[in-house]
Structure formats: C-alpha cells, structure tokens
Amino acid sequence: MALSCTLNRYLLLMAQEHLEFRLPEIKSLLSLFGGQFGSSQETFGKSPFWILSIPSEDIARNLMKRTVCAKSIFELWGHGQSPEELYSSLKNYPVEKMVPFLHSDSTYKIKIHTFNKTLTQEEKIKRIDALEFLPFEGKVNLKKPQHVFSVLEDYGLDPNCIPENPHNIYFGRWIADGQRELIESYSVKKRHFIGNTSMDAGLSFIMANHGKVKENDIVFDPFVGTGGLLIACAHFGAYVYGTDIDYNTVHGLGKATRKNQKWRGPDENIRANLRQYGLEKYYLDVLVSDASKPSWRKGTYFDAIITDPPYGIRESTRRTGSQKEIPKGIEKWEKCPESHVPVSLSYHLSDMFLDLLNFAAETLVLGGRLVYWLPVYTPEYTEEMVPWHPCLELISNCEQKLSSHTSRRLITMEKVKKFENRDQYSHLLSDHFLPYQGHNSFREKYFSGVTKRIAKEEKSTQE
C-alpha cells in the first residue's frame, strides 16, 4: 500500500456500460502514459466509483483524453461512509494542497452527483452549505468557474432497493471528462460506408485503447471489412492498413446494407469513411488478401494488430485454396496464371486463430499488442480454449454476451519474445490444443441454440 501514500489519489467516475472492459482499458492507458495502476480498493466490480493512485495530474488528464469507459476524474480530497466521516477526512486533507484552488482571486462552483438516487434542489443546497468549514475565499461562478468541486454519493447498484443514506460519499476537484462523446460522433448510424458486421463505435475505441494505440503507430487489421476499427485507431493518430478476402467489400461494390438502398455508391469505401472524419492522411492502404496466406516479407512491421475475425454467422469464414486440398496444391498455386480465380474454401475457426497468432508473433514489434474477438459457446467455455502462443502474453480476457448460450471475448495479447520458426508449431504440444479446436463447431452450436429458441417460442404462443 506504499504506492497510495506517495502518489496523489484520484476518483474515477466510470460509465455503467461494458463493465468487464473497464479495468483493462484503464490499466492499458495508464501503462501507455507512464503510470502504474495502483489502488487502495480491493475490488471494483460493478461500482462506478474507483479510487486510484496516479503519479501526476498530467497523467490523469492524458488518461481522460483517451478513455471511453470513464466519465470524469477528480482529485480526491476526502471520502467516507457518512457525512461525518467525509468532513473528518476533508479536515485531514493538507491545507497547502487546497489553497491554490481556493484563494480570493479564483472562482468556483460545487456540484452534487448522485448514483442510483435523485435529490431535490433543497437537499443539494443543504449538502453544499454543510461544506462551509472549507477555506473557500473565491467567488461563486455557476457559468464559467475556474474550479469545479463535486460531492459524489453512491447509493448502491440496486434500483429496487435504494437506501436512505449513501454507502459512500466522496468530495474532489474536477480534473477532466472522458471521451464518451466519441461514441455518438463516430456512431455507425452516421457513417458513410457500413456493412452487416461493422463494429460499434464504443467497442472500436475500447479495442484501440486495449491495444495501446498511439500517435504515429502502424496498425493493421487482417479482417478489415468496412474499416470500423481502423477509424478508431486513426482518431488516435495511428497510420492504418488492412486486408480482406472480400473483393466487393474492399472496393465498395455490390449490394448495400442500408435500408432503402439497393447498391453501394461509387464513393462508399474505407477511404471515404476516414475522409468523413478528417482522418484520410492516416490511410495507408487496404488490399484484397487471404489472411491464411500472408503476403508479407519476414519482419516486424506493426505496432498493433486490431481485428474482428468472421465467426461464420453473419459473415462467412473463407480462405483460398485448391479443391483437392493436397500438400502439392500450394506448388500448383504458385504456377497458376495471373488470371486464375482461386477456389474459396471454408476456414475453420481454430485454423484462423492459429494463423492470426502466428502472424502477430511474426510481424508485431516487441511490446506490440494483438487485440481480437474470440466467439465462444458459453456452456462449454473454459479458459483453456483461449488460443496460446509462446511469443504472446495474455493481458486481458473480457466477455460480451451475445445470447443466452453464446458470447464473444475480447482477447488482448502482448508480444514478449522474438519469433522463431519453431514457435509456429508450439500449439501442437500444448494442453490447450484440443479445447482450442472446439471453436470449429461454434456456428453449428450457435444455430442449434437459435433453432431451439424459435421452437420454444412457437410452442409458447400456441399454448
């Protein structure tokens, strides 16, 4: 606990959305900006109030310039489980740390924030008046104050059982707000070019933050689709590149996915999406390519690989190959004329993730991150099913439920070891290999569950 004694304490007000993704995002961003995650709290769970120890206010501000999981951050001056405990805590806070924000030439206002309860205006004023013992010497300015102070009260998580008194009360100086507005400004609904599986804007930014994407990075998406993940990375100043096996998607051709629109327009493509947000300068290129047969020379090119592989549900899992599928087929492929159109074959999920991890291990710089979605059949899921590679360390594993029996997990891995040729076969010796192959039947299990649910609904309506 020595860390919390030497560092300033801050209060994070978290959004109550994507709860499992919040802690890995904050840890990744603190690491990115040179901070170390430290807290006096034993658990965070679903609570929106987190007390953190952060080295400096600059790091706290940088954190809020990136996070979409946190709403605001405050310099914590005091907290307690009752008003009396709060006031006692405030009286013990060093006066020399308060004075720069309370002097006579300053302006301020005090806000009351409650979680899971609404207070009347009279109750709010009563709480503000109770803070008169603090040495405020400045003038109140409700419109444009220099400093904003907040009283935050936590009434628990159960909306059906709201206590009379709060569980915890906090008081602090507001530092900055997070980037929650990006979720709306980059909404897929407003985007020029979209597809059936375009990634939600909020999740795209979370993935970029988990991947520690930063300015001047080179970020690659091997299953780029309509480029939603590239947009989030480009927003943070990274140069983006992608590939996809679907010619029509890469070139913006074919049928449109929007309602009341039959065909895609001539300017519906990934580059146009980046142009829409003023990010075209970060566009490197997007190519038609097969992820199972990378066309890259050996070397480390990418600072991060951020991707959402197809699961075989709304987008098919495909790769190029020969109908005969014999080892010599690769040699024949190399001799084929340029006009040859390759056969499209099914791409097993276990093979897809094996190829993805090998590719990441070979092309990521040391310390670079791989962030991808792993679909799972919930009743059979175990941690052993998460793909493993000797060059990659698992950083986080977060679940997003899709249905009662399926979910997808956001896997973040970091390259910690230089790639060697023998590493691409290490999975065969791992205890994880057999459970890992269970991903191949995800599509069948998914639709099996859908069929059972439809039959159950039809039966209930008939009754």
From Swiss-Prot:
Subcellular location(s) of the protein: Cytoplasm
Reactions catalysed according to its record: guanosine(10) in tRNA + S-adenosyl-L-methionine = N(2)-methylguanosine(10) in tRNA + S-adenosyl-L-homocysteine + H(+)
Keywords: Acetylation, Cytoplasm, Methyltransferase, RNA-binding, S-adenosyl-L-methionine, Transferase, tRNA processing, tRNA-binding
Pfam families: UPF0020
E.C. number(s) listed in UniProt: 2.1.1.214
GO CC annotation: cytoplasm; tRNA (m2G10) methyltransferase complex
GO terms of biological process kind: methylation; tRNA processing
Reported function: Catalytic subunit of the TRMT11-TRM112 methyltransferase complex, that specifically mediates the S-adenosyl-L-methionine-dependent N(2)-methylation of guanosine nucleotide at position 10 (m2G10) in tRNAs. This is one of the major tRNA (guanine-N(2))-methyltransferases.
Protein name as it appears in the record: tRNA (guanine(10)-N(2))-methyltransferase TRMT11
Lineage of the species this protein comes from: Eukaryota, Metazoa, Chordata, Craniata, Vertebrata
